[in-house]
Amino acid sequence: MACVSPSYWADVPGQFKAFIDRCTPWCNTHEPHAALSPGKKGYAIALRTGPGMKECERIMDSIEHFFGHLEIQCSGHLGLCSVEYREAVEARQEEIEAFCRMIMEEGERTDEA
């Protein structure tokens, strides 16, 4: 599962929090709870307009915390700072593509196992 979130005042936006709330029946803090099949992997991606990575790290930590309650292993994260316009993302294309390749390669290794 890949979760991507922009920074809204140093946190995930309300829509993302609503998504997390909707997943409560599958969280290990809710008894009895449904469960996802074991072995799921997650990837946390955060972006913000400001230059500091600390805010992205907070968002990625929130996503990783969510994964933990779903018993999903966080297998990677990517923080993108100073992203206000499309051009800023285009300038990071190689980094984003490398991250996506890493996800795909990890998936292929899992399929082979």
Give a label for each model feature:
Residues M1-H65:
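Helix-loop-strand module that forms the ligand-binding subsite of alpha/beta enzymes
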Residues E57, D61-A113:
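Glycine-rich phosphate/pyrophosphate-binding loop and the adjoining helix
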